[in-house]
Amino acid sequence: HQQCINNRICYNAQVDLAGNVSIKLVRGNFVSEENPLFFKQLLSGVDIGQSDSSAKQMANFIYIIGDKNTRECVIVDPAWDIDGILNVIETEEMKLKGSLVTHYHPDHVGGSIFGMNITGLAELMEKNSAPVYVNKHEAEGLKQVTGLSDSDLRLTDSEEVLSIGSIDITFLHTPGHTPGSQCFRVGDSLVAGDTLFLQGCGRVDLPGGDSEVMYDTLTRRLAKIQDEVVLYPGHNYGGKPSAPMGNVRETNSYLQIKSLEDWLGIMGG
């Protein structure tokens, strides 16, 4: 039967006729059976898109968040293998109600980048035309990259809340990597896209990036996130899939830069 430690590390334990105990970790589900939150982390090139070398190289995290009682869910940053993502949702017996966009870069939403044509929201909408939630400052960029129309989008603002069943998802506008980058607060989890990684932050030298705005996001906008909240990033750059914000603050050198002047000297601006 399945057991969970601290609602995060889940495992199946079995005892054979000789009394031997075997334990198998359950990867990706980080909540207990008592908690209605459904939260699953997928890694491109590993959990989905296994045959795509670019998916493995880019190491994007995709998230499925929902309510285990109503079986409703949303996808965060659907890309690389839409059929694979939908197969996971079907296997989990969930119903897709929408997609959440952290930012408009093609490795997160589909499109062309670095000579790669990545499947994403355009293909998903052909199979399931549920609303796409994107920050109001990111909508134009998203439409250009994916070909979606205004009618496909639901524009979000900071501190707005989307309820999926009994699960509340709070949108947090965290610009810097792009003008409309956003994070999602779900209980004691923060899904951060490319705003913040375990060992770094999103680039500010790409179109729409702003070094000074990123510094404000990291030092002010995310400062209120409690140490015990677990950071779930947009890429597997840190060697681990997640970490408490308190640990990230201790080990991420980008969060230890004390002044805007020092920041601009390192990051440019």
Predicted regions and their residues:
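Active-site-proximal beta-strand elements of phosphoester/diester hydrolases
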Residues: 38-46, 74-77, 168-175, 190-193
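Metallo-beta-lactamase
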Residues: 145, 168-173, 178-267
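Short Gly/Pro-enriched turn/cap motifs at secondary-structure boundaries
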Residues: 53-55, 152-153, 173-175
